[in-house]
Amino acid sequence: MSNRVVNLLVPIISIILGLLVGAIVMLFSGYDPVSGYIALWNGIFGDSYAIGETIRQISPYILAGLAVAFAFRSGLFNIGVEGQLMVGWFTAVYVGAAFELPMIIHLPITLLAAALAGALWGLVPGILKATLKVHEVIVTIMMNYVALHVVNALIKTVSGGSYKTDKIQPTASLRSDFLSNLTDYSTLHYGIFVALAMVAVMWFLLEKTKTGFELKAVGFNENASQYAGMNVKKNIILSMVISGAFAGLAGAMEGLGTFGSMTTQGGFTGIGFDGIAVALLGANTPLGVIFGASLFGSLKYGANNMPNAANIPLEIVSIVVALIIFFVASGYIIRVGLQRLNKKKEAK
Amino acid sequence: MSFLEVLYFIIPTSIAYAAPLIFTAIGGVFSERSGVVNIGLEGLMVMGAFVGIVFNLAFVDVFGGWTPWISLLAAMLVAAIFSIMHAVASVSFRADQVVSGVAINMLGIAIALFSVKMMFGKGQTDFIQEKIPRVNIPILQDIPVLGPMFFKSVYGTSVLAIALAFVAWFVIYKTPFGLRLRSVGEHPMAADTMGISVSKIRYTAVIISGGLAGIGGAIYSQTMTGDFGHATINGQGFMALAAMIFGKWHPIGALGAALFFGFAQTLAISASSIDIDFIQKIPAVYFHILPYVLTILALAGFIGKANAPKANGEPYIKGSR
């Protein structure tokens, strides 16, 4: 088997294993896994409404996945997508509500503001990593909690003590009557196009520009990049900033498309953490991220159908997602297994 | 409230908040000293909190007043078993330990919530009858000023937590096991050459961390919330991780950091009721973010990179240099 095939097989085997273990869990908990997975399937593809909602769910997942993947390519692990997403969400809603401008200016400015807010939240761990060698994983985790509390406090402030911000102006909204009608009045919005555009941006940036080459080089080997005359510090900071900008846009999807406002959050949205799964499954490539986001976005939305249709708690899907991450992370053992299988075949 | 009364309130509450963090952070010390990064502390704590509550609810008729204590043991056991997953992934399967830890976190909360919905048919459990009791420590409680601060109506678990820090210090620095643990975390190849089984030590360390985090979670749920739901632990595990780093991977340091974080959390929840002018004027959000901001500052300022165990996060592959 060539390396390429193995690289493709590892995520596929992980998904199968994850679903399999999920079925075993359902079986042992006294649920019927077959009707569970049928309910999941119908929750994703059942009718045009479900498909619309599923695609809507996929858009922030693509952006969160891009954020994690982009940082990974420069050797950085951005667990802070969750926090960057929240500040992006709040900023989008705030800018979207506070100004009255024609749509052609308002919407881009709002999206830009969300990206900037996320970028700012990524800048802090980036600078700390580049200048003081502080581990970005810890800083981004801490920044998540700072974001959670700060955003909640800001919502209270701007809404005058309430738990919810104002609705955004229609000129900043990503809502689309056309897409909504097409999918039986789902909340599908134009965000999916923004997300796909960003996939193209990431691909172009990484594969076709000098900056992208440097970012990847730093990810492969910092010392070699330094020796070749690249500015490693600048690239680390830049990578975190761009990663944060993607995450901020993911927040804008929720703010400008799905909800149109923001309520105080009791905990994290989970999209940022699932972004880690998306990136891992997609092997940190732009196209892979689309694939990973489609899978996890579908699973997450389809799960909502499971309590009603099959009477199974929807957390089963979170178990499956976590297991898939676990298996992808343990890819080494899958590779070993595949090699052994291969040798046996050759021996015959 | 006079200033002294404020202290009588804040100090015991801080220690109560710190106890789960101390247990979990010291669990983290064991794991990371052996060279296995354990971001999964949060998930392990969730597991402990969940098992503690469910066991307490199920067996309260059998064990009566002893229920919360036996629940702690049950939580320890289950979380320790759960942590084996992390050990297998990061030691035997050479997985990225941070990613595996993230999976443990997601899995912990998912399994706990799935089971809660299965058992109770709703998003959170019932409230437990027998919480961990508060006790007055005889004689010591009569000391003026200090008595009411430290020895009146304290949780038994808080005393245990502080004792654990010293036990952990003894184990890590004064026993052969501790020496092996640290050597495996600093230079696994050297340790291997001396005949120490790297994977055995690492497995043991991760399982200890799982057990301690489980106790930590069960203490939190059985003292603070009294039930289990999706927001019960909400970041305590990450806070413990921060305490471990803030405490420079040292049990006594972790103890100090955890006590400090307990204090910050107490301020956050009680700032509005404390009748001191300058505290009232500070918005609560600053207290909420204080532990996290301090951790970032501590990492940036006081703690150099050198303090982390050298081989932390690297799988040991025999024969490779």
Identify the function of each model-found stretch.
Chain B
Residues M1-A25, V37, V51, V60-S71:
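Membrane-interfacial amphipathic/re-entrant helices at transmembrane-helix boundaries
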Residues M149-F228, P251-I252, G256:
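Helix-loop-helix "hairpin" substructures at the membrane interface of multi-pass membrane proteins
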